[in-house]
Amino acid sequence: VHWTETERATIETVYQKLHLDEVGREALTRLFIVYPWTTRYFKSFGDLSSSKAIASNPKVTEHGLKVMNKLTEAIHNLDHIKDLFHKLSEKHFHELHVDPQNFKLLSKCLIIVLATKLGKQLTPDVQATWEKLLSVVVAALSREYH
């Protein structure tokens, strides 16, 4: 994947504005509420039976931060995303048996959360750049499935 200097700068500028724990929690909360079947992979999280339970669940916050920390690694290693996610792809395929469609759903939720945080700053160009970033991450996470 080729990244222009403008794309790299756009990713970094947006990233600097994010509170990772908050964005991660909100994206995962949105995933679980909008696509409730995705919770089946998170039985160890306890109560995910309602919007309120999901939003206040500390394990959702913890895992959301874990997701965002991995995304941080990707942002700081844009030219090596495929390698960076290799082991995680293996784990999600071989051990966790996660449907790779869920990665796409989470990326959609993340874009929506970015829109709520950035408002008018999420211009079409900014969105396109972040959609590109997340599609590269999703492809890397889904790689083991092919």
Swiss-Prot record:
Transmembrane segments: none annotated. It comes from the Eukaryota. Heme b binds at H63, H92. InterPro entries: Globin, Globin-like_sf, Globin/Proto, Hemoglobin_b, Hemoglobin_oxygen_transport. Heterotetramer of two alpha chains and two beta chains (an easy dimerization is also reported). Involved in oxygen transport from the lung to the various peripheral tissues. Belongs to the globin family. This is Hemoglobin subunit beta. It comes from Latimeria chalumnae.
